[in-house]
Amino acid sequence: PSAGEVELAGHALGELDEDRRARVRAEHVGFVFQSFQLLDSLTALENVMLPLELAGRADARQQASALLERVGLGQRLSHYPRQLSGGEQQRVAIARAFAAEPDILFADEPTGNLDSQTGARICELLFALNRERGTTLVLVTHDAGLAARCQQQLRLEGGRRVAAAG
């Protein structure tokens, strides 16, 4: 931005060095990517455990297992991403994103690579976890129906805001 400040959890991000910004992101921000971004060499359980272990959580295995159970993958803990369907991979990514209990979660086209039925289930899961955990959800989508479910919407065209609702 050319003016103003960005604050997250009481931290003025522009005043922090890169290491401190990375720490704030790790402690307060979660991401769900359209392309899942799972580590191929790790199982579903290990992918979800990773941010918990990096945060020094002694209960990483239990928390990751519980989250995978919550997203319906309790029987797929030891499966690698290549052994999972697109919808299953996205559910692992969602579990990983919520693992560290972020204050804010950015979801970039979370249903973009999924068929409509799987996409609808993923949306239900995202909104359910959002409500249960009190996480602020910032959702980027081209799906007008999905956007309509959000409390607030911003519409961009050519990189500029053209409308706001909610």
Segments from the language model and where they lie:
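ABC family nucleotide-binding domain
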Residues: 1-156
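H-loop (His-switch) and adjacent beta-strand-loop-beta switch element
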Residues: 153-165
